[in-house]
Design a protein with these regions (language model features):
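Topology signature of small-to-medium multi-pass alpha-helical membrane proteins
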Residues: 2-147
Length: 147
């Protein structure tokens, strides 16, 4: 068995898919260093966050959020952006999955953290944008037939 990022069948990449690719690159580039900082210092002090914010949550520290942030919202977004550029058949599906993941991540953050910042709402909108682009991308390529 051989794994390859090269698609067997290149899917159409409509112009609007570049919106998702750009959002994935920006999100990934911003998420990786923050995730690494949370992993390096799970108290959040390195990021200037009060320890009381996370101690009262089910996580107890920023370690698990840091791993998710660096792995899924960081490396995952960058990897799927590459798949989108390469017109891999899975790119629209994974774009949708990461959009839903980002929405979930932000909603959990809104529910458990005592304060939000403008980036919270920007990334919530980014998650919805990824989801909608994925939906129309799948529709355009014929991989999803809803209407």
């Amino acid at each position: 068995m051989q794994l390859s990022l090269a698609p067997r069948v290149r899917v159409e990449r409509p112009r609007f898919a570049w919106i998702a690719i750009a959002l994935q690159v920006v999100t990934g580039v911003l998420a990786v260093p923050v995730g690494i900082m949370f992993i390096a210092d799970p108290s959040g002090a390195l990021m200037g966050l009060p320890p009381g914010w996370i101690e009262a949550t089910p996580f107890g520290s920023y370690l698990v959020p840091g791993v998710y942030l660096a792995g899924v919202n960081g490396i995952g977004m960058l990897a799927v952006a590459v798949l989108g550029v390469r017109r891999h058949w899975s790119a629209p599906w994974l774009t949708g999955a990461l959009g839903v993941g980002l929405i979930t991540w932000i909603l959990v953050q809104i529910l458990i953290m005592p304060e939000t910042m403008i980036l919270t709402w920007v990334f919530l909108a980014t998650g919805f944008a990824l989801g909608f682009v994925a939906l129309f991308w799948l529709r355009r390529t014929g991989q999803l037939r809803l209407w």
